[in-house]
Amino acid sequence: MKTIHITHPHHLIKEEQAKSVMALGYFDGVHLGHQKVIGTAKQIAEEKGLTLAVMTFHPHPSHVLGRDKEPKDLITPLEDKINQIEQLGTEVLYVVKFNEVFASLSPKQFIDQYIIGLNVQHAVAGFDFTYGKYGKGTMKTMPDDLDGKAGCTMVEKLTEQDKKISSSYIRTALQNGDVELANVLLGQPYFIKGIVIHGDKRGRTIGFPTANVGLNNSYIVPPTGVYAVKAEVNGEVYNGVCNIGYKPTFYEKRPEQPSIEVNLFDFNQEVYGAAIKIEWYKRIRSERKFNGIKELTEQIEKDKQEAIRYFSNLRK
């Protein structure tokens, strides 16, 4: 996949861009709804013998336009989003820098410069996609703005539990600890990436060594508690349990940030500094304070057995 980063005004020459069918959207999470949009564009591209292109934007428009209701943390930071869009068969990805100048374009200017001007023959987007200043351009106005110079297709919404599959729906699920629902909406396990860092090394003294994780990006971290997870380290994938929390059994004063600690099953390596990817599967329980090490270790063993049963049933 060819990735082209654009800052407005772009200086790309139309004739040098491949004739394409383009899917447009912010695509945070690259969830099932987004996959339907890109999949629709792919099908049309194959039928017409054209290149499959995707256009996304960075940073999130709400960060630029000051809509505080949007969270700062993303389901998929840009690097992860690019990788997932590539996996869907995209041939060319345009990453447009979203800034105030770009946001001030009229709908017609956006179409002329970023659709027609990039040699797009057919545009595809979800029913709620908007473009141009104040989001005044919609999928209903797009045919008029295209003025016969390109076609367009609107993709209807996908629903789950009678609710539209959306990035905000997934963010809410993750913030509530409902990683199972989030995974259904995403069409794959939610994951975060980080580096194994030094912790207080207490886990190994009680028989449950853990890898402490420092995050690479501003991911949405599920709420405190214990989760069944899979973790990829050094190219190998292991089942495990992850504790997100403040370790109230050991700390009277609550630390500023919760720690992310993973106990991997059948794993006994020193991996400080290694990259780690954690996939979240099920919330086992909330965080609690125990009356000593014995009670804590007994509960950790129960958590481990529950995770083992969960992954055993998952394979059936």
Curated annotation (Swiss-Prot):
Signal peptide as annotated in the record: none
Class of the enzyme per the UniProt entry, highest EC level: transferase
Gene3D superfamilies: HUPs, Riboflavin kinase-like
EC numbers: 2.7.1.26, 2.7.7.2
Catalysed reactions, as listed in the record: riboflavin + ATP = FMN + ADP + H(+); FMN + ATP + H(+) = FAD + diphosphate
Top-rank taxon: Bacteria
Coiled coil regions in record: none
GO molecular function terms attached to this record: ATP binding; FMN adenylyltransferase activity; riboflavin kinase activity
UniProt cross-references to SMART domains, sorted A to Z: Flavokinase
Keyword ATP-binding listed: yes
Record keywords: ATP-binding, FAD, Flavoprotein, FMN, Kinase, Multifunctional enzyme, Nucleotide-binding, Nucleotidyltransferase, Transferase
Stored Pfam families: FAD_syn, Flavokinase
Function summary: Catalyzes the phosphorylation of riboflavin to FMN followed by the adenylation of FMN to FAD.
Protein name, as recorded: Bifunctional riboflavin kinase/FMN adenylyltransferase
Source organism: Bacillus subtilis (strain 168)
Gene: ribC
